[in-house]
UniProtKB/Swiss-Prot annotation:
Compartment list: Cytoplasm, Cytoskeleton, Actin patch
Keyword Phosphoprotein listed: yes
Protein name: Altered inheritance of mitochondria protein 21
Presence of the UniProt keyword Cytoplasm in the record: yes
UniProt function note: Involved in mitochondrial migration along actin filaments.
Keyword entries, A-Z: Cytoplasm, Cytoskeleton, Phosphoprotein
Coiled-coil residues: none
Region spans: Interaction with SH3 domain of ABP1: 383-396
Subunit structure: Interacts with ribosomes. Interacts with ABP1.
Organism encoding this protein: Saccharomyces cerevisiae (strain Lalvin EC1118 / Prise de mousse) (Baker's yeast)
Phosphoserine modifications at: 36, 70, 104, 183, 206, 231, 284, 324, 576, 620, 623, 625, 627, 667, 671, 675, 678
Protein family membership: Belongs to the AIM21 family.
Compositionally biased tracts (Basic and acidic residues): 9-19, 179-213, 243-272, 339-361, 372-383, 471-482, 556-576, 667-679
Length: 679
């Protein structure tokens, strides 16, 4: 419908956050919103380049309604249990005077600058020097100007913007710091000044840390010692204790190198490991002293001076460190440097001397007592045992006992006989001394050997009373040897040394008849037989000239045989072993010269001729003498001719065997062809 107007939807009402029960009017609510909400910035906010360091915050709402006296006093450090109670009591008694002197000095001088304490765990190198330098600069900055720098403002704004990111443990630490500062009666202007000073310290620290710390190097340094030394910088140089002098030396050179820090740390560690008990005893006293100092500083009225510092509480890692020590038993470097206790040191030096004196006195007393005891005779508690008697020898057997008795009787008889003979020989020697000295020497030797009684076992030894025959012959006089004849001497030489031994064999049995009937052959070595036999036999024959002229070869051979048979007997023919039968007759040579001409023509007729030649050879060899046979061999050269004939005959035989009995090679070839065609 065109006449109708579209309805307007009203806006949804928005709920406003108000503290009152009834809603306000629109103008009033707009003014409240404008006042409560900050205006939006036109430009982009400044973002800090690095994360700001956590700063101590104050609780304005809590501190405003509370008085300074009503606040509870929280201790700086948790007390640590000590096991060595006796040493602590001694140290407390010895250091009471020093504590009184320190309290009097602190009450006289107003300490204006107190540096913040840090935890001793893993402090980076170069941090100690930066802390002292920052403390001095912060004091000078507070005197000259109270307005913070723009960099400090940015860091302060960034820290305020990141308040929501702070952990609860840091909040607890902040609250502890707020309690220890005791700044309830200060105005807002004074609080702003404190914040500016803290920002200056943080900025200077961050700036110097970037310059001084190279890389990620970390050195465990005892910072608590440096903090105490920084707190005592306001004291005059004429200090009583050694710690004041060392603090002045260390603060004069804030820009110390890394090498000095390392040396300082090594010295501290050596002292800690050398005397850990003294350090434990002194740490508790230092803690108490620090607590008193802090109480005095807080009790003094704080004027409107520009240079104001805040004592920071210990780090939040103290309870966690103690818990970790109890769990893991890991040693931790103490926070404060131990102070020398001169009286306790003197007492400890005196103790070993007194102990040594006591020990020496005890040693002297023991020596005197031992000397006195050595003079007094001691009665043994037990009597000494008697030695056991020697073992009784066993009784010998009956045979051994009888043998020993027999030997004793024989020795007694020998001694009795030797005594009589020695008396007779002594009288005879006195009479014959001048006559014959050789006889006396022999008799003395005989007496000496007779006294031995056969103690030495010699081969062929008889009874102990009787000397062996070899000694008797040597000791016998030369007259007795001359009296004996040659036959007796030969019999004595050939006589056996001992008796004949019986042959071992089966007893009670007879030998077999063959063995018993065998006659024993006895050889006489002294007899010699001479045998004569002929080694050579010589036969004589006629000369060549006579044989050729007188007789024919056949007759000559027959005559030679007859003469030989007559001249040589039959026994000599059998016994003569060596005969020279090498003679040849001259008629054989003529026949052998004729043989090669007839051998080729009549091969069959050759056999009877060879037999006849052999017979003639035997006849001629028997008839000729060896000298003649040798002469004939050298002159006629028949052996060479025979060898040549034998070689020719062997060659002919070999040709026949190879050709198969045919004289010519052509005939053999024709015969092979005929046999091949026939097949």
């Amino acid at each position: 419908m065109p006449s109708e107007v579209t309805p307007k939807v009203p806006e949804r009402p928005s709920r406003r956050k108000t503290s009152e029960l009834f809603p306000l009017s629109g103008s009033e609510s707009g003014d409240i919103k404008a006042n409560s909400e900050p205006p939006t910035p036109a430009g982009t906010p400044n973002v800090p380049t690095r994360r700001p360091i956590l700063k101590a915050k104050t609780m304005t709402s809590f501190e405003s309604g509370m008085d300074q006296e009503s606040l509870p006093k929280v201790p700086l450090q948790r007390p640590v249990r000590r096991s060595t109670t006796e040493e602590l009591n001694n140290v407390m008694n010895n250091t009471s005077k020093e504590l009184e002197e320190i309290e009097s000095l602190i009450s006289k001088h107003n300490i204006h600058n107190v540096s913040r304490k840090k935890s001793p765990t893993s402090v980076e190198e170069g941090k100690v020097a930066a802390i002292h330098q920052n403390g001095q600069r912060s004091a000078s900055d507070n005197k000259t100007s109270t307005n913070p720098s723009p960099l400090e403002k940015n860091e302060h704004e960034g820290a305020e913007g990141n308040e929501s990111a702070i952990s609860p443990s840091n909040l607890v630490n902040k609250s502890n710091n707020e309690v220890t500062e005791h700044s309830d009666s200060e105005d807002l202007t004074e609080k702003q000044k404190v914040h500016a000073a803290l920002d200056n310290e943080a900025g200077d620290r961050s700036h110097f840390e970037e310059k001084l710390i190279p890389g990620d190097m970390k050195v465990q340094v005892d910072v608590s010692k440096d903090v105490e030394e920084g707190s005592l910088n306001a004291l005059p140089p004429s200090g009583i204790t050694e710690s004041d002098d060392k603090a002045e030396k260390f603060t004069k050179h804030p820009e110390s190198s890394l090498e000095e820090l390392q040396k300082h740390q090594e010295q501290q560690e050596e002292k800690i490991f050398q005397n850990p008990t003294d350090e434990e005893s002194t740490t508790s006293l230092n803690e108490k002293q620090e607590g008193k100092d802090n109480m005095e500083v807080n009790s003094q009225p704080q004027g409107p001076s520009d240079t104001e510092t805040v004592i920071a509480a210990t780090s939040s890692n103290v309870p966690s460190q103690i818990a970790s020590e109890e769990e893991n038993d890991v040693p931790v470097i103490p926070r404060s440097r131990p102070k020398k206790d001169f009286e306790a040191h003197v007492q400890k030096e005196e103790l070993p001397n007194t102990q040594e004196k006591r020990v020496s006195e005890e040693c002297d007393s023991t020596l005197i007592s031992t000397e006195e005891e050595s003079k007094i005779p001691k009665i043994p508690s037990e009597r000494p045992k008697r030695r056991a008697p020697p073992p009784v020898p066993k009784k010998p057997s009956s045979r051994i006992a009888a043998f020993q008795e027999m030997l004793q009787k024989q020795q007694q008889q020998d001694l009795h006989n030797n005594g009589n003979s020695s008396a007779t020989t002594a009288s005879a020697d006195i009479a014959k001394k001048h006559t014959d000295s050789s006889i006396t020497s022999d008799t003395t030797k005989a007496d000496f050997t007779s006294k031995l009684n056969g103690l030495f076992a010699l081969p062929g030894m008889v009874n102990p009373g009787q000397l062996p025959p070899s000694l008797e012959k040597k000791l016998s006089s030369p007259d007795t040897e001359s009296k004996l004849g040659p036959q007796d001497q030969s019999q004595a030489k050939t006589g056996p040394l001992g008796g004949t031994r019986r042959g071992r064999g089966p007893r009670g049995r007879k030998l077999p008849s063959k063995v018993a009937s065998v006659e024993k052959i006895e050889e006489d070595d002294n007899t010699n037989k001479i045998e004569i036999f002929n080694n050579w036999n010589v036969s004589s024959s006629f000369s060549k000239e006579k044989v050729l002229i007188d007789t024919t070869p056949g007759e000559q051979a027959e005559r030679a045989l007859d003469e030989k048979s007559k001249s040589i007997p039959e026994e000599q023919r059998e016994q003569s072993p060596n005969k020279m039968e090498a003679a040849l007759c001259p008629f054989e040579l003529d026949e052998k010269e004729k043989l090669p001409a007839n051998a080729e023509s009549d091969p069959l007729s050759q056999l009877p001729q060879t037999n006849t030649v052999g017979n003639r050879k035997a006849i001629s060899e028997e008839s000729l003498s060896p000298s003649e046979a040798i002469a004939n061999r050298d002159q006629n050269d028949t052996t060479e001719i025979q060898e040549q004939q034998m070689e020719d005959q062997m060659e002919v035989d070999m040709e026949r065997e190879l050709s198969g009995g045919y004289e010519d090679v052509d005939s053999a070839l024709h015969s092979e062809e005929a046999s091949f065609h026939s097949l």
